A protein has these predicted regions:
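Basic, Lys/Arg-rich alpha-helical nucleic-acid-recognition elements, primarily the DNA-binding modules
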Residues: 1-83
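Short secondary-structure junctions
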Residues: 46-50, 116-120, 278-287
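Short, ordered beta-strand-loop transition motifs
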Residues: 50-55, 167-169, 300-302
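General detector of folded, globular domains
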Residues: 63-76, 80-83, 91-112, 117-120, ...
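Short glycine-rich, low-complexity/disordered patches
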Residues: 85-88, 115-129, 206-228
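Exposed, interaction-prone assembly regions rather than primary DNA-binding/catalytic cores
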Residues: 87-186
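Well-ordered, non-membrane alpha-helical segments in soluble/globular domains
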Residues: 100-106, 185-206, 236-238, 314-323
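Long, compositionally biased intrinsically disordered regions
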Residues: 175-183, 213, 217-368
Length: 368
């Protein structure tokens, strides 16, 4: 099998996920007609099977499919397709299957954004050897399974809802998948995860990739669909006993990305501090400096109106801006991408006016 083919890419994604969702197809650039032919061929070759239970349909590898991948690239698949790993022997209960499928979507989005997810494309997480990292460039993604290789040290964070961590030049992002509703959330567990990552960053967990003892902010990214799920998250109160997500401040930054090609563009932007700086400079060029006397968070002033750059969709920052506007009984102004406008308008109502960045024009200028 050609390791550059779309068939191999799909099989690889199933292998590292355990069970794949059909929602990954757009990120693999599979059209409906091509996808139907591809699935038929892979099933007839005995490489995949469809697992259907509890009204959830997923794609799994057959024994033959696993053997093929192990023969083609043992260094890529041995950890996922051997022993009793969850990806090699996925369970049938609905919550676990949903988590595997959510992981498959997240991995597909990361790959679509050009971010490595396979072990041979990145240094070992706890190697401690800068030479191992010399040939790799950021950003890099590590799954939750990879950090759990520390064993007993990670017992207290085993219940974290995180799918993994994304290391960029200026920050470390903890990745979550929320879907169309608030995910289950245990504040103390996620705080322990943040403390765990902060400790190991300072101990040079990523030898050669980032400078030891540098203060890298640890932020969160939430993947959800549709875009309006962000409003649901920002308005969530955590439910009974605070067992579901709400803006609890466990992270200082909580970004929302839609599960879509628009989300891919936003992911690339978050991973590029240079591009964010360029965009900020363009957006702020005709506006006035921050006014500290206003007593609320803002990035610039338009006339007498506080303006917030909202394109990175930091839910915590947006929530604080809304609260401050309401408290001071003033109107604010938001600058966001066009695909984010409806959600922000619904969330802010009359408290803010909105100016949009044309996503298509942005992509043509910076990504083509």
């Amino acid at each position: 099998m050609d390791t550059l083919s779309k068939a191999y890419k799909l099989l690889s994604l199933i292998a590292i996920s355990g069970e794949c969702s059909k929602d990954v197809y757009p990120f693999l650039y599979l059209t409906d007609s091509y996808n139907e032919k591809l699935m038929t061929r892979l099933k007839s070759d005995g490489l995949i099977k469809i697992h259907y239970k509890d009204k959830l349909r997923g794609i799994r590898l057959t024994r033959r499919g696993k053997d093929l991948l192990l023969s083609l690239s043992p260094e890529r698949f041995s950890n996922n397709l051997t022993d009793n790993s969850e990806t090699n022997r996925p369970r049938s209960d609905l919550p676990r299957r949903l988590r595997l499928q959510q992981a498959s979507i997240a991995y597909a989005m990361l790959q679509c954004a050009g971010i490595p997810v396979y072990p041979e494309d990145k240094p070992a997480l706890f190697s401690g050897n800068p030479q191992d990292s010399a040939k790799f460039a950021l950003p890099l993604f590590y799954t939750a399974r990879e950090w759990k290789e520390l064993g007993a040290e990670t017992i207290k964070i085993n219940n974290s809802r995180s799918l993994g961590i994304l290391l960029c030049e200026d920050a470390l992002y903890v990745l979550y998948f929320t879907g169309d509703h608030p995910i289950k959330w245990e504040y103390r567990t996620e705080l322990r995860l943040k403390a765990f990552l902060n400790y190991h960053l300072k101990q040079d967990i990523f030898a050669g990739l980032c400078q030891k003892n540098t203060d890298y902010p640890i932020k969160a990214i939430f993947l959800g669909s549709p875009m309006d799920s962000a409003r649901i998250l920002m308005e969530s109160n955590g439910g009974f006993q605070k067992s579901y997500f709400y803006l609890d401040g466990s992270f200082d930054f909580m970004h929302f990305l839609p599960v879509s090609m628009e989300g891919i563009t936003l992911l690339k932007l978050l991973c590029s501090p240079a591009l964010q700086s360029t965009l900020n400079t363009l957006l702020l060029s005709d506006l006035e400096p921050v006014n500290p006397d206003l007593g609320l968070i803002h990035d610039t002033i338009k006339g007498t109106t506080p303006v917030l750059l909202s394109y990175n969709f930091d839910m915590l920052r947006l929530s604080r801006f809304k609260t401050a506007l309401s408290f001071h009984e003033i109107t604010g102004h938001l600058i966001c991408f066009d695909f984010q406008k409806d959600t922000l308008q619904s969330y802010f109502g009359d408290l803010a006016t909105i100016e949009t960045i044309d996503l298509a024009k942005f992509e043509r200028r910076f990504f083509h």
